[in-house]
């Protein structure tokens, strides 16, 4: 309702809108994911809403990386979370998405270099222009960062 009522207001969706995976939502990712997709698609219809892509490494999302004997590799990270990134990128496109690290909170689950390497792997099939948007231009536009 807010995005529709204020179309000139830039709204930033943080951490994929927080698809929780602990507490009453533990082990329900397969059940929650379709509803999350539906809600995200509806939200993406508002051109003033942008998505920050990151934060899924947080323990509250239920992927369990923080409980593993070793932190995940970038490939392991991508294999468990790619569907979330693909969904957001499909609905919002690179023009309204930006990668973000959510450090230091993500540090409980993954190292900073491994996380950014995972983002590069997620974006590997995108054009150079789309990668520029995901890794810089969208954030610069939304946060009004100038050279």
Q: Where do the protein language model's features map onto the residues?
A:
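Catalytic pocket-lining loop regions of alpha/beta-barrel enzymes
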Residues: 1-98
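Weak global preference for isoleucine
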Residues: 10-12, 22, 32, 102, ...
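Short, glycine/acidic-enriched loop or turn micro-motifs at the edges of active sites
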Residues: 18, 103-105
């Amino acid at each position: 309702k807010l995005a529709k009522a204020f179309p000139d207001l830039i709204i930033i969706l943080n951490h994929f809108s927080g698809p929780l995976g602990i507490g009453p939502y533990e082990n329900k990712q397969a059940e929650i994911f379709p509803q999350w997709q539906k809600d995200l698609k509806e939200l993406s219809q508002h051109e003033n809403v942008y998505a920050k892509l990151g934060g899924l490494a947080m323990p509250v999302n239920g992927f369990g990386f923080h409980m593993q004997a070793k932190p995940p590799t970038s490939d392991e990270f991508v294999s468990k979370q790619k569907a979330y990134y693909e969904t957001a990128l499909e609905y919002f496109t690179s023009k309204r998405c930006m990668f973000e690290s959510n450090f230091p909170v993500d540090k409980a689950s993954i190292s900073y270099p491994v996380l950014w390497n995972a983002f590069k792997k997620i974006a590997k099939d995108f054009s150079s222009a789309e990668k520029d948007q995901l890794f810089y231009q969208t954030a610069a536009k939304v946060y009004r960062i100038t050279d």
